[in-house]
Amino acid sequence: MSDEEEVTYEEEEEEYVEEEEEEVVAPEPPKPAPPPAAPPPLIRRRSSANYRSYATEPQVKRKPKISASRKLQLNTMMLQIAKAEMEREEEERAREKERYLAEHCQPLQLSGLSRSELQDLCQELHARIDVVDEERYDMEAKVNKNITELEDLNQKIFDLRGKFKKPNLRRVRLSADAMMMALLGTKHKVSMDLRANLKQVKQTKKDDADKDIREVGDWRKNVDALSGMEGRKKKFESTGAAAV
């Protein structure tokens, strides 16, 4: 009995080892393929046909990144900073003006001066005033020139961008002389007669047409004359004379 049990036990061990080898050697099952990606949603065009339905659809409202109170607070802070900077610039400008006047406009010492010295001082002051007026005039001329140049450049920019509104022009029929006068101004003095260069066409075609019309009119008269009993009589007589 012991031998039989050992044999069966060995057979069971061999079968168990074979099953383990089969389990190890068995290939892994293939992985399932990933599901296909969903196509992107079609962009709906806002045409006139579906505009009403699009407008009635519930729209998803995007939340703003900054709340209204925060935006108002930032605007007030920016206005306060700009106001403080403007006040500081005005104060600096006033201090600079006072310093310049203190350097260039010193108080006059008129005590103890004679009449001739006062006259000389007045002449010197008038000469300085003339120099200052000349400088002021030159500066104003430069400023006006720069302003006109800036306006011209701004107009060119608007022309290039096409933002200016074109006026509604009306078509006007102009002759050659009027057109040349508009282009050249007073320089144009020679009158241009464009009809002088045209070729003269003979009226033979018109005469032929009149002749054809005349012939057609005569034929109609002959038809009217041959109609009726008298016409048949004339036609019979003419055919009889031709037969004889």
From Swiss-Prot:
Record's compositionally biased regions (Acidic residues): 1-25
Keywords on record: Acetylation, Actin-binding, Muscle protein, Phosphoprotein
InterPro entries in alphabetical order: Troponin (IPR001978), Troponin_I (IPR050875), Troponin_sf (IPR038077)
Bias type Pro residues, positions: 27-42
One term under GO cellular component: troponin complex
Residue numbers spanned by region Disordered: 1-67
Molecular-function GO term, any one: actin binding
Positions of post-translational Phosphoserine modification: 2
Entry comment describing in which tissues the protein is expressed: Heart.
N-acetylserine PTM positions: 2
UniProt GO BP: cardiac muscle contraction; skeletal muscle contraction
Homology family: Belongs to the troponin I family.
Known role: Troponin I is the inhibitory subunit of troponin, the thin filament regulatory complex which confers calcium-sensitivity to striated muscle actomyosin ATPase activity.
Assembly description: Binds to actin and tropomyosin.
Descriptive protein name: Troponin I, cardiac muscle
UniProt organism field: Xenopus laevis (African clawed frog)
Gene: tnni3
